[in-house]
UniProtKB/Swiss-Prot annotation:
Residue runs in coiled coils: none
Amino-acid positions noted as binding acetyl-CoA in the UniProt annotation, renumbered to this chain: 116, 123-124, 274, 311, 539
Name by which UniProt lists this protein: Malate synthase G
Active-site residues, as the UniProt record annotates them: 338 (proton acceptor), 629 (proton donor)
Protein keywords: Cytoplasm, Glyoxylate bypass, Magnesium, Metal-binding, Oxidation, Transferase, Tricarboxylic acid cycle
Pathway(s) it belongs to: Carbohydrate metabolism; glyoxylate cycle; (S)-malate from isocitrate: step 2/2
Catalytically driven reaction(s): glyoxylate + acetyl-CoA + H2O = (S)-malate + CoA + H(+)
Record gene name: glcB
Assembly and binders: Monomer.
Amino acid sequence: MARVEQFGLAIEQDLYDFLVSEALPGTGVEPEAFFQHFSSLVHELAPKNRALLAKRDAFQAQLDNWYKQNGAPSDLAAYEAFLRDIGYLLPEGPDFSVTTSNVDAEIASIAGPQLVVPVMNARYALNAANARWGSLYDALYGTDAISEADGAEKGRGYNPKRGEKVIAWARAFLDQSVPLAGGRWADVAGLALTDGYLDVTLASGDKTGLMDPSQLAGTFSEDGSVTSYLLRRNGLHVEICIDAKGAIGAADKANINDIRMESAITAIMDCEDSVAAVDAEDKILAYSNWLGLMKGDLEEVVTKGDHVFTRTLNPDLEFTDPQGKPFTVASRSLMLIRNVGHLMTNPAILDRDGAEVPEGIMDAMVTAVIALHDIGPNGRRKNSRRGSMYVVKPKMHGPEEVAFAVEIFTRVEQALGMEPNTIKMGIMDEERRTTVNLKECIRAAKDRVVFINTGFLDRTGDEIHTSMEAGPMIRKGDMKQAAWIAAYENWNVDIGLQCGLSGHAQIGKGMWAMPDLMAAMLEQKIAHPKAGANTAWVPSPTAATLHATHYHQVDVAGVQAGLKSRTRAKLSDILSVPVASRPNWTPEEIQRELDNNAQGILGYVVRWIDQGIGCSKVPDINNVGLMEDRATLRISAQHMANWLHHGVVTEAQVIETLKRMAAIVDQQNAGDSAYRPMAADFDTSIAFQAALDLVLKGREQPNGYTEPVLHRRRLELKATAIPAKV
């Protein structure tokens, strides 16, 4: 591919053309100025980037040596002293409160679900942006949230018995969320607006209204009749849709045709763990979809059966408040974008020495200039009404790396003419050195931080790699019961509240990774708002609608107020290493652990390498579909590498397991015409060789990250064959 030289940068022609012809026009930023500033940014900050990565390696070497001499720490005080001596654990400064300004309500004050989607997939991105609202009826009917017992099977057509169960569940939810002064929602026979109040007629003929009349936010009318009532609890809206001729409403005594939930309040458009972006071609796709979202013109032609339609961004909703004043309600999730971390470089742009530029610097500059289509001088202000750009920054290790990200953002703002602190930062608390120094990490970004989030998956991967030499780790399924996990989750909330995030920023919790198990999610994920999290990750718009019910049941602001006075989680618990003290696993248990890890690795890696798919639903050993991305891959690969290193398993056993499970993964993908079987020839299957690398060379991967192997192997495939098209 030809390259264009600009101020010492060698930019692949297609990327250059995209920037000059599509991204920059309309932003007020001229190409010459853009590339001049971009070059300065790269050549001045790339050396700092490399130095920070070298520091990671130096810490790891010191930790490896300590563990080799001492094993798993039994004297946690001595271990903590060692971490302080080497500068891994830093002194904690005085208390402070964050000062982030111009933060949209979706982040500052509204508690609710958050989606994370691969920005390279336009359909997923549009679905996520439009997932601000979802049908509660559809979410219940189409999932296992409603049992199929007693004749309530989903079936091919509409099942009235199942519909009755859905309606009963939804009415019971309304009793909790927007209770009536008298009677139950199941007995409602009619709704009307009278003198600014919701007038409710029960089947008995009695009249009632809302227990709290202020929960009526507004109405929408067509042809003089109210067709929807907008209610509100804990800052979240629920819309009761009336249609006497509707498929459901016609048979409903109150003509309620649907109940629509305000669902995914925010959505992260991901350039990182859920995508496979290894070169200019891939980055252009990511950036062009982000451009379409910021300009509002992204669209995707969707085919469902015989029905073909074009999906676009939903327009805002119009209502009239009880006093007769019109107002607008957002119909799209507030979009954040996750840039990559500090580790990777990308061949799309080379510096003056011919080296690949740090991908995190490239992401910052390009995604920010694209955001000007929304927040710039001539911006639409359809995403951020407060004029802010929201960047989630992953995989940072400690406050020095957070400060470096702040420096990048500051330089980008100066280059693009943005006001200082326009670019807000979400800090992923997913690396051990960030966890133990979280207060100082937040301090480093106190004018920008809008989000801290525990990422159990990556955090576990880092836990394993950090203490690789300490001994064999406990089984992967036992990790959630380990002492460090509960302390880590509570510590994140405690530190966030101590730093004044409540009412200003999100304190988030991690992903529900089983998209088919919605009944279990409804039962369990309420623990996140109860723990003080004002957002948590969900795997689909449907899951967002169901998880939204939890934020009606739990007043997160009240929970956070109560948690501010609790004793902070113990650092010593966080520092405890999850090594199996006296492993007594049977050979069958060991093999099952290997099988499960291998299946997850192969099922994900084969689609990443061969098809460029960065996020997949992969069946586990029990045939439960699990959402897999690079974070889950990191855990599985590091866990296998750890057991191999400590002799729990042999290399021959690992290879045999991977080969046997590859055949099973091949069978599971037999219906995919784009799939390339691995077991046909293990030696020539680049995907299988990548899986081998991730495990057999797992100890030498930087911090246990999977990106170096994945990128190298994906580029190898793209160079030697025409990649499979999805």
